[in-house]
């Protein structure tokens, strides 16, 4: 619990051990000792039978964590998972892309080129929205400002404190960005880089503000009147809200990665801007020049 993520105003935590993390986040409803832990030693020993037995022993919505470090570890777990599922077990899985790749037996692919990513030419500009407050994101944003041809707009997210003001701010940004994108200019909209904190604040109140700010930010995409050539969302919550709420994506084609850990979707026909490349850029991913 010593990283900047652990100290997050809304989603902070104390426990770094995932078993203890689950106990912390469930308020003690799930005890750390009751969490099934698939050890790295079992994975490296390719103990398929042992891991399968652990999975078969899970019941009543029990929790499982997998201590995988590399793709080879994930592949071992995927085999044991398949075997347990073949015996009638059902699991709800929350994971990163590595498990999807292993389960689907998807081979390594080269990083995307512009030709692979852009399937329909457009003279419009793109839209970039930055919600993450991590130090890495802020450094990356400053690096991006060195690129010519992008207009940078900082949303005054502190207006969330005054009813109706943040919505007015977002509406003005939407109108301006729509005009610029239609002219072929790419716009980058970011929240203020300093997280808003208040005296005697509570995590619940901070979460309410965070949701309101995220809604305002995603509306800068969802209410555009011009179709952008591409969409980039920086930050976990931001990228989720932009994909689901703003772009209204129900089905998308995963084109691949533009950089390690940065996937690209091609939005479906049902979405707000069909066939548009959507770059999902997590807040803690990449280096400063990425």
Task: Please place each PLM-identified region on the residue numbering.
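Active-site histidine-anchored catalytic micro-motif
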Residues: 1-16, 228, 233-236, 240-289
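Cap/lid and interdomain-hinge subdomains that line or gate substrate/regulatory clefts
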Residues: 1-74
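Generic secondary-structure signature for well-ordered alpha-helical cores
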Residues: 10-13, 20-31, 56, 60, ...
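General beta-strand structural signal in soluble alpha/beta enzymes
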Residues: 30-39, 64-68, 91-96, 101, ...
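Long, internal scaffold/assembly segments composed of regular secondary structure
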Residues: 71-135, 146
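Extended C-terminal subregions enriched in glycine
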Residues: 207-237, 243
